[in-house]
Amino acid sequence: MIEKVPMTRGGHAALADELKKRQSVDRPRIIEHIAEARSHGDLSENAEYHAAKEDQSHNEGRIAELEDKLARAEIIDVSKLSGDTIKFGATVTLIDEDTDKKAVWQIVGEAEADAKKGRISITSPLARALIGKKKGASVEVVAPGGAKAYEITKVEWR
């Protein structure tokens, strides 16, 4: 059975955009670089050629990965979700019980996680600790940096 990859509509669109760019912009540019490097002669000692081939390999690997994720995508429309129990797609506001610092995280699929944008993977230690909890609950998260305790102050669906 094919394992579905849960993702938000926005996450799906971002991956589709990246795929399109890699296929229509990056791939032709890399092919051009390979042809140019090949014209410089002996390929066995041509660093430019080998670098371009490595770029091509990396790009083609990422294209295959994106095609696979998009083919297995299960798009979850977060705007249609509701309730006060945390699950995939929830945007959760937390207060660090040690420092009183506020943090806001949206729980998303692995393919669209980006901590700088406040999006954490559903498989992350924090998301796993939050799933199934409700506003007002305290959670302890054991992560590589050590254990942290948080209070859940808000659960939203954006």
UniProtKB/Swiss-Prot annotation:
One of its GO terms (biological process) is DNA-templated transcription elongation. Keywords: Coiled coil, DNA-binding, Transcription, Transcription regulation. It comes from the Bacteria. GO terms for molecular function: DNA binding; RNA polymerase binding. Residues 41-61 are annotated as: Disordered. It holds the Pfam family GreA_GreB. The keyword Methyltransferase does not apply. Residues 51-74 form a coiled coil. InterPro entries: GreA/GreB_C_sf, TF_GreA/GreB_CS, Tscrpt_elong_fac_GreA, Tscrpt_elong_fac_GreA/B, Tscrpt_elong_fac_GreA/B_C, Tscrpt_elong_fac_GreA/B_fam, Tscrpt_elong_fac_GreA/B_N, Tscrpt_elong_fac_GreA/B_N_sf. Necessary for efficient RNA polymerase transcription elongation past template-encoded arresting sites. The arresting sites in DNA have the property of trapping a certain fraction of elongating RNA polymerases that pass through, resulting in locked ternary complexes. Cleavage of the nascent transcript by cleavage factors such as GreA or GreB allows the resumption of elongation from the new 3'terminus. GreA releases sequences of 2 to 3 nucleotides. Belongs to the GreA/GreB family. HAMAP family: GreA_GreB. This is Transcription elongation factor GreA. It comes from Nitrobacter hamburgensis (strain DSM 10229 / NCIMB 13809 / X14). The gene is greA.
